[in-house]
Amino acid sequence: MSILAIDIDYFKALNDRHGHPTGDASLRKLAGLMTRNLRRIDTIARIGGEEFVVLLPRTNLSEAAQVADKLRSMVERTEFPGGDGQPGGMLTVSVGVASLRPDETGADLLARADKALYEAKDRGRNCVVSASQSAGSARSLTRSRI
C-alpha cells in the first residue's frame, strides 16, 4: 500500500485572483483527471482545501512514485480554469509519496507522505518527493520542470 499526498501549487493565489468558483472548477477538473488516469482499485479523497490523497493498494514505493510523476506531468500539460494566471502560466502540483511499513499505522503513513509533500513545496514546487523506507527521512525522487 502506498499513498500520494497531492497539493495544488499557489492555489490561494488562484482563488484570490479569479475567485472561488474558478478555484472550485480547477479542483473538480483535477479530481476528474486523477479519476480517469488511476486504476479502479485506487481511492482518491480530498482532505481539505486544495489537498488530495490517493491510496494505491498493491503498489510499492517505486511504482507509486512513477504514478505520482505521471499525474504531476499530466496536470502541468492540462489547461485549468485560472491556470494562465498562475506562476509559469500553468497549474502545477506538488506530491509526497510514501509506502506502508510493517510497523506503522495509517496515520503514520499519511504523516510521512505529508512530510514529503512539504519537502516538495520547499524544493520549489511542481515536483515529487518520496519518503524513504527508513524512518523520518525523505529523498528527492523527481523534480522535473519545463
List each language-model region with its residue ranges.
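Catalytic-core segments of nucleotide cyclases and related cyclic-nucleotide turnover enzymes
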Residues: 61, 65-68, 98-132, 136-146
